[in-house]
Design a protein with these regions (language model features):
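Short, conserved phosphate/pyrophosphate- and ester-handling motifs at nucleotide-, phospho-/glycolipid
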Residues: 75, 159, 193
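ALDH superfamily catalytic-core signature
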Residues: 2, 9-149, 169-172, 211, ...
Length: 401
């Protein structure tokens, strides 16, 4: 049994709080909640392909996909050429009735959405916009100029793309900025330098990565879909852990051992100490896909796991064995709400409802309360990586014997 939801982060948080009042505390919420999805294009990318993928990712379905591209970074060496090609491609888009075969982009969902997006565009620096029909709930595909993802106040659910150029020496900073926004659903990267691709894959914190292709759409069994942080709780839809999350749980049994009392600041210091030697993850698993496409499934341990209850010490040892940063503590509800960042809480004991309520009152990402005897399964974050191997000159593995 569980609750499954797709929608906004705020609505997911509201559902989580209601669940603490009306359902047993061990019932999971599986939320998939969108995000500020970014793409980076470096100077080695095939511009024609990158432009096509940007058009599809940002404007298809009128930008009304949780996976849609919102923030585009282009290396400054090619930024002007890229903009010329992008704006030219946008001029060719047909906006109108989606029942017409020649139409590329239809309306947004309702007038309220149209008014909100229009007001947002009017308050910002427009680099380029097409022309939309005067009647109906249409929004012209628009590109806005920003300095980076930190300029985006929220997700704008429509055909609006934010554009910024960057110096390649600042690539690590750009990735930190993207990770720092708290969302982590989809991310795209266009580059023909494999070392750089692997570096970005290792640093970016999102659920679904797309290399040298568009970043919308996911195939069940090949690209399990779902985000991290403000973008979702996991497990991924279409992945091996989704259905088992709804199965009946065997709850943890308390052990006669009480952990040390700790304040929020002490818990934070303990996490920071463990993070210096945290395990980065296991070898990726190859998933099926067509020729010219490499699909990989990665499992990485959740970074900050707080273990509570009489058996917290044993629970923490089990979490540490997976590579998590795990702390066993006896902590008040007030201090539990004050710990800056938590990825999961594991608990065995009689106060589960109070703990679930304290966790639901936190701002930011939804923190799962794990009470299952096999809780280790849910301490691993899933990532899907999809690589178009044709973009870098073909699949070199085909040449190997």
């Amino acid at each position: 049994m569980g609750v499954c939801f797709t929608g906004s982060t705020k609505t997911a948080q509201a559902i989580n709080r209601l669940m603490t009042q009306h359902l047993p505390p061990h019932i999971p919420l599986i939320a998939e909640t969108g995000g500020l999805n970014a793409m980076i294009v470096d100077s080695t990318a095939l511009l024609e392909q990158a432009v096509q993928d940007v058009i599809i990712s940002a404007f298809q379905s009128a930008g009304q996909r949780c996976s849609a591209l919102r923030m585009l970074y282009v290396q400054q060496d090619i930024a002007e050429d890229f903009k010329d090609m992008l704006f030219g491609a946008m001029r060719a888009l047909c906006i109108g009735d989606p029942a017409e075969a020649a139409c590329d982009i239809g309306p947004v969902i309702n007038q309220a959405s149209q008014k909100k997006i229009t007001r947002y565009i009017q308050e910002r620096h427009v680099l380029f916009a097409t022309i939309a029909p005067e009647t109906g709930c249409f929004i012209a595909p628009t590109v806005l100029s920003v300095t980076g993802i930190q300029d985006l106040p929220e997700e704008i659910f429509g055909p609006v793309l934010h554009f910024a150029s960057f110096d390649i020496k600042d690539l690590d900073r750009v990735i930190r900025d993207i990770n720092g926004c708290g969302f982590g659903l989809t991310f795209g990267f266009h580059s023909r330098i494999d070392e750089r691709v692997q570096r970005v894959i290792s640093q970016i914190n999102v659920g679904n990565l797309y290399i040298n292709r568009n970043q919308i759409g996911a195939v069940v069994g090949s690209q399990p879909f779902g985000g991290h942080g403000l973008s979702g709780t996991g497990p991924k839809a279409g992945g091996p852990r989704y259905v088992p999350r709804f199965a009946k749980q065997t709850l943890l049994q308390s052990a006669p051992c009480k952990p040390s009392k700790m304040k929020a600041a002490q818990v934070e210091r303990a996490f920071q100490h463990q993070e210096q030697t945290a395990f980065s993850g296991s070898k990726p698993i190859n998933l099926p896909g067509p020729t010219g496409e490499l699909n990989q499934y990665h499992l990485t341990p959740r970074q900050r796991v707080l273990c509570l209850g009489p058996g917290a010490e044993q629970l923490a040892k089990r979490a540490l064995a997976l590579g998590c940063c795990a702390i066993a503590a006896d902590i008040s509800s007030e201090d539990l709400s004050a710990v800056p960042q938590l990825d999961a809480v594991v608990y065995s004991g009689p106060d589960a409802r109070h703990i679930r309520k304290a966790l639901s009152a936190r701002d930011g990402a939804i923190v799962p309360l794990l009470m299952d005897e096999t809780f280790e399964i849910w301490l691993m974050k899933e990532r899907s990586v999809c690589i178009d191997t044709t973009a870098a000159g073909g699949n070199a593995a085909l040449l190997a014997s």
